[in-house]
């Protein structure tokens, strides 16, 4: 035969997502769609959503790592928003970066202004020295 006709049909290669090609967990396709629909620029290049997804994944990993370190090793509790919020405020760089960000269900940070604290009197100082 001359090679015409049906030979073993070509199988289609399994599709790979852009996230798996980049080695990311965050969805590159969704980030690309949001960049296009958000009117941030007239055109969006192919590398921009990959880079943005990688940055978002890195920041998320850093935040979760800080919150995870805050948990005691003995307990098997989940990472909650108040713990995440406290961990962010204790970290200097992330606090500077995310200073104006509100975390849902994060609670409030314990902070008492020095003006509101009780004043130390002379009698309390003298009783402690005796």
From Swiss-Prot:
CC terms in the record's Gene Ontology section: nucleosome; nucleus
Where N6-lactoyllysine occurs, the residues are 10
Q: Where is this cross-link: Glycyl lysine isopeptide (Lys-Gly) (interchain with G-Cter in ubiquitin)?
A: 14, 16, 120
Which top-rank group of organisms is this from?
Eukaryota
- Residues with N-acetylserine modification: 2
Q: Which residues carry this modification: N5-methylglutamine?
A: 105
The record's section on Pfam families has: Histone, Histone_H2A_C
Is the Glycoprotein keyword given for this protein? no
Q: In the record, which positions carry N6-glutaryllysine? A: 96, 119
GO MF terms, alphabetically ordered: DNA binding; protein heterodimerization activity; structural constituent of chromatin
Matching entries from InterPro entries are given as: Histone-fold, Histone_H2A, Histone_H2A/H2B/H3, Histone_H2A_C, Histone_H2A_CS
Could you describe the post-translational modifications of this protein?
A: Monoubiquitination of Lys-120 (H2AK119Ub) gives a specific tag for epigenetic transcriptional repression. Following DNA double-strand breaks (DSBs), it is ubiquitinated through 'Lys-63' linkage of ubiquitin moieties, leading to the recruitment of repair proteins to sites of DNA damage. H2AK119Ub and ionizing radiation-induced 'Lys-63'-linked ubiquitination are distinct events.
Which positions does the record annotate as the modified residue N6-acetyllysine? Answer: 6
Q: Which residues carry this modification: N6-succinyllysine?
A: 10, 96
Cell compartments where the protein resides:
Nucleus; Chromosome
Keywords of the record: Acetylation, Chromosome, DNA-binding, Hydroxylation, Isopeptide bond, Methylation, Nucleosome core, Nucleus, Phosphoprotein, Ubl conjugation
Extract the ranges annotated as region (Disordered).
Answer: 1-22
Sites where N6-(2-hydroxyisobutyryl)lysine occurs are at: 6, 10, 37, 76, 96, 119
Q: What does this protein do?
A: Core component of nucleosome. Nucleosomes wrap and compact DNA into chromatin, limiting DNA accessibility to the cellular machineries which require DNA as a template. Histones thereby play a central role in transcription regulation, DNA repair, DNA replication and chromosomal stability. DNA accessibility is regulated via a complex set of post-translational modifications of histones, also called histone code, and nucleosome remodeling.
Assembly mode = The nucleosome is a histone octamer containing two molecules each of H2A, H2B, H3 and H4 assembled in one H3-H4 heterotetramer and two H2A-H2B heterodimers. The octamer wraps approximately 147 bp of DNA.
Family classification = Belongs to the histone H2A family.
Tell me the protein's name: Histone H2A type 2
Organism, scientific name: Xenopus laevis
Lineage per the UniProt record: Eukaryota, Metazoa, Chordata, Craniata, Vertebrata
